[in-house]
Amino acid sequence: MATVLAIETSCDETAAAVVKKRHILSNIVASQIDIHRPYGGVVPEVASRHHVESINDVVSEALSQAQIDWPDIDGIAVTCAPGLVGALLVGLTAAKTLVMLHNKPLIGVHHLEGHIHASYLQNPDLASPFLCLLVSGGHTSLIKAEDCGLYRTLGQTRDDAAGEAFDKVARLLDLGYPGGPAIDRIAKLGNPKAFALPEGKISLPEGGFHPYDTSFSGLKTAVLRLVESFRLRGEDVPVADIAASFQQTVAQALTRRAIKCALDYGLSTIAVGGGVAANSALRQQLLTAAEDKKLQVLFPPLSLCTDNAAMIACAGAEHLDRGHTSALTLAALSRMPISKVMELYPGSSPMHPPLELDAE
């Protein structure tokens, strides 16, 4: 299996990693959380500037920590979609420069495919097909992973992503940024049954509800009205109880849909990825429900839930082993359905024919 250096700059983390045989040799992340905290969210222009400042040091540290040099690198992977275009361009430019400088293949990686491959880093023998629940600040999807590069979206949010809802509710409760960890911490002090909040179902034209799609905008509005009702009465807002009730509702909605989807499609394994995969309520609810239905649930370690380059390197290595490489004209895209992943590999670049790697 290929040894791959990867770069990830899709949002506010500047990351580089080296992965070999689904084993992490290094995984370096320069976080910008403290930089964006005063703004209550990620500022794209600020994120791009800090990527430029950090990228060289992060890549150098990844190679140093891996104790590896360029002759041992088989290819360079980079996140190219989806994400903040300015941020993606920093990583893409760095990767292309290294590709030309060291004469290596370029492998563009879809960010969501990276999150799916985070599960392989902890479970190298994970076999397809399986269901992946991707929950992050920008995405909430149920995806059937049929093979490397072959994915089918079965359910998704119709409005806010789960992580986005956490950030917005945290702002309503004056808990700061990022909202996910803040709500998770204070929810432990509250009663998750204190308030009945709407789960957010998607009505179908023919009647009934979509079994796998979600909506969090109504839940967010319900929390807003609840907070305002306490303030209008001049009462203290029960922040811990509201946070616990909100978190419980989100975890319940995601768990119900993931379990039903897995059972309906005959998939025995649910792999969870994305920043919200770190949420304690989601972990507890999904593990309990899955055990009852004799399903296996795989959660990555916390370090692989949030954006990182190890997951990008893992996905890149899988594609490189199959002869999938990207052209130097590879572009940064703000949006791209995961079903179109293979469009990133229109054929091997004439400059870099597919590597003949041993199948160790």
UniProtKB/Swiss-Prot annotation:
Disulfide bonds: none annotated. SUPFAM superfamilies: Actin-like ATPase domain. Binds 1 Fe(2+) ion per subunit. Keywords: Acyltransferase, Cytoplasm, Iron, Metal-binding, Transferase, tRNA processing. GO terms for molecular function: iron ion binding; N(6)-L-threonylcarbamoyladenine synthase activity. Its cofactor is Fe(2+). It comes from the Bacteria. GO terms for biological process: tRNA threonylcarbamoyladenosine modification. Fe cation binds at H111, H115, D307. Required for the formation of a threonylcarbamoyl group on adenosine at position 37 (t(6)A37) in tRNAs that read codons beginning with adenine. Is involved in the transfer of the threonylcarbamoyl moiety of threonylcarbamoyl-AMP (TC-AMP) to the N6 group of A37, together with TsaE and TsaB. TsaD likely plays a direct catalytic role in this reaction. Belongs to the KAE1 / TsaD family. This is tRNA N6-adenosine threonylcarbamoyltransferase. It comes from Acaryochloris marina (strain MBIC 11017).
